[in-house]
Amino acid sequence: MIALLTGRLAHKSPDAIIIDVNGVGYRVQIPFSTYYELPEEGKTVSLSIHTHVKEDSISLFGFRTLAEKEFFQLLISVSGIGPKMARDILSNIQPEELAAAIVQGNLVRLSSIPGIGKKTAERLVLELKEKVRKMDVAPSAQEAPSSEAPAEVADDVASALVNLGYKEAVVRKVLAEMSIEPDASTEAVLRQALKVLMK
């Protein structure tokens, strides 16, 4: 099983990348959080890998940290959650915030994640609560709010999206139409903006 890949970043998109390892290109599916941390194409990248094997295919899922990979593996152990849904979940919420919601039994927060209904949220709490408590990612009872102001976050997100090739006027229009919470992180707003731009 492939557990780690290090090579040249040949291509990147918000949901998958191609890593060139000694002339062999590996397609690796990724969450938005990993995409946000990627270097420029042509640079060296190293990702922790989960290899998902089915009867007719092998898929690779890559993560910037081992903790994120471990949380992904926890998610796919839950009945009804496959690897693509687990990746999408991690694209919409940070592991620390997800851990907090599971440990606290916050069904409202869990159900607000795209693709997760009430029954799936209940299964997440039932099947993962004790496992999450034992993980390093397990949160304290209350997460510290972000200190970034919405305007600063919007500027950071705009800069990141322009660097990805989006036109600044389009980016600014999307951000202006979005509702940015006072404690929203740059990464969360970036994920939200990318979803709008990719429609």
Swiss-Prot record:
Keywords on record: Cytoplasm, DNA damage, DNA recombination, DNA repair, DNA-binding
Primary localization: cytoplasm
GO CC terms in record: cytoplasm; Holliday junction helicase complex; Holliday junction resolvase complex
Pfam families: HHH_5, RuvA_C, RuvA_N
One GO MF term attached to the UniProt entry: ATP binding
Keyword Transit peptide listed: no
Chain intervals for the UniProt region annotation (Domain III): 154-199
Positions of region (Domain II): 65-143
Region described as Domain I: spans on this chain: 1-64
Keyword Transcription appears in the UniProt entry: no
Compartments, record wording: Cytoplasm
GO biological process: DNA recombination; DNA repair; SOS response
Chain spans, region Flexible linker: 144-154
Protein task: The RuvA-RuvB-RuvC complex processes Holliday junction (HJ) DNA during genetic recombination and DNA repair, while the RuvA-RuvB complex plays an important role in the rescue of blocked DNA replication forks via replication fork reversal (RFR). RuvA specifically binds to HJ cruciform DNA, conferring on it an open structure. The RuvB hexamer acts as an ATP-dependent pump, pulling dsDNA into and through the RuvAB complex. HJ branch migration allows RuvC to scan DNA until it finds its consensus sequence, where it cleaves and resolves the cruciform DNA.
Swiss-Prot/TrEMBL domain comment: Has three domains with a flexible linker between the domains II and III and assumes an 'L' shape. Domain III is highly mobile and contacts RuvB.
Similarity comment: family membership: Belongs to the RuvA family.
Quaternary structure, from the entry: Homotetramer. Forms an RuvA(8)-RuvB(12)-Holliday junction (HJ) complex. HJ DNA is sandwiched between 2 RuvA tetramers; dsDNA enters through RuvA and exits via RuvB. An RuvB hexamer assembles on each DNA strand where it exits the tetramer. Each RuvB hexamer is contacted by two RuvA subunits (via domain III) on 2 adjacent RuvB subunits; this complex drives branch migration. In the full resolvosome a probable DNA-RuvA(4)-RuvB(12)-RuvC(2) complex forms which resolves the HJ.
Protein name per UniProt: Holliday junction branch migration complex subunit RuvA
